[in-house]
Curated annotation (Swiss-Prot):
Described function: The alpha subunit is responsible for the aldol cleavage of indoleglycerol phosphate to indole and glyceraldehyde 3-phosphate.
Catalytic activity: (1S,2R)-1-C-(indol-3-yl)glycerol 3-phosphate + L-serine = D-glyceraldehyde 3-phosphate + L-tryptophan + H2O
CDD domains per record: Tryptophan_synthase_alpha
Claim: Amino-acid biosynthesis is one of the keywords in the record: yes
Residue numbers annotated as active site: E48, D59
Organismal lineage: Bacteria, Pseudomonadati, Campylobacterota, Epsilonproteobacteria, Campylobacterales
Pfam family, one: Trp_syntA
Assembly behavior: Tetramer of two alpha and two beta chains.
Protein name: Tryptophan synthase alpha chain
EC number: 4.2.1.20
Taxonomic source organism: Helicobacter pylori (strain Shi470)
Length: 262
């Protein structure tokens, strides 16, 4: 319901969704909470929060470093605790999780979905789980009313795009390019054909991710037919560059978000 309300409100305002990604516990749990509070106060549409993992294969160097910083003190219990705190802090903002399959399967699929539901999470995207394996999680996602998000990639067949569109709830994570995460100077690929194809299969909003780091990228994404963007590496880079100055970090995050959504 939170995603539905968000997209309906944005549509009335003729605005794009802007969803930031950060890793929970980076650089520590207390500051991670302050970062999330700053993001919310800066007017982001929703949150995409990562669980730190030792082998984040879908991520480039910036977010890999973020995982490593968080792993120094990360635990599933602390992740859940912070998620609860975020949900208590703001009951309305959609919260999405980005996790790697191993974390979910080692915890127990149904246990994991039950736990995140209790924490107030709205959606889950499993970074390294192909669509073909969707049945391993869909039953638990539906049982616990968690929206399962799937990825639509530039090299996907029409059949795979149809599956991603039909099974994704909340939104479809559409890749601006293949490869791993990372901020780009320019959006190299035109995702308009993929987005157009997705929209023939489902009305579920398509969000563009991978490489979003400038205001003009959001304009480009809008021109491609996307309903919003997900921005990770450019934001995580600000965290990395200001590890020794918490106030400067939060101010720079605030400035960056303001610039992106103005």
């Amino acid at each position: 319901m939170r995603y539905k309300n968000m997209f309906e409100t944005l549509k009335k305002q003729e605005k794009m969704a802007f969803i930031p990604f950060v890793t929970l516990g980076d650089p520590n749990y207390a500051l991670s909470f302050e970062i999330v509070k700053t993001l919310i106060a800066s007017g982001v549409s929703a949150l995409e929060l990562g669980f730190a993992f030792s082998d984040p294969v879908a991520d480039g160097v910036t977010i890999q470093a973020s995982h490593l910083r968080a792993l120094k003190h990360a635990s599933m219990a602390k992740n859940f605790q912070l998620l609860r705190a975020i949900r208590d802090y703001n009951p309305h903002i959609p919260i999405g999780l980005l996790a790697y399959a191993n974390l979910i399967f080692s915890y127990g699929v149904d246990n994991f979905y039950a736990q995140i539901k209790e924490c107030g999470v709205d959606s889950v995207l499993i970074a390294d789980m192909p669509l073909i394996e969707k049945e391993l999680v869909l039953k638990s996602a539906q049982k616990h009313q968690i929206k399962q998000i799937f990825i639509a990639s530039p090299n996907a067949s029409n059949k795979d795009l149809e599956r991603a569109a039909m099974h994704s709830q909340g939104y479809i994570y559409t890749l601006a390019r293949s490869g791993v995460t990372g901020a780009s100077r320019i959006l190299e690929n035109d995702a308009s054909a993929i987005i157009k194809t997705l929209k023939t299969f489902s009305p579920t909003p398509a969000l563009l991710g991978f490489g979003i780091s400038k205001k003009e990228h959001i304009k480009n994404a809008k021109g491609m037919g996307a309903d919003g963007v997900i921005c990770g590496s450019a934001l995580v880079k600000i965290i990395e560059e200001n590890l020794n100055d918490e106030n400067a970090m939060l101010e720079r995050i605030k400035g960056f978000i303001g610039e992106m959504i103005s």
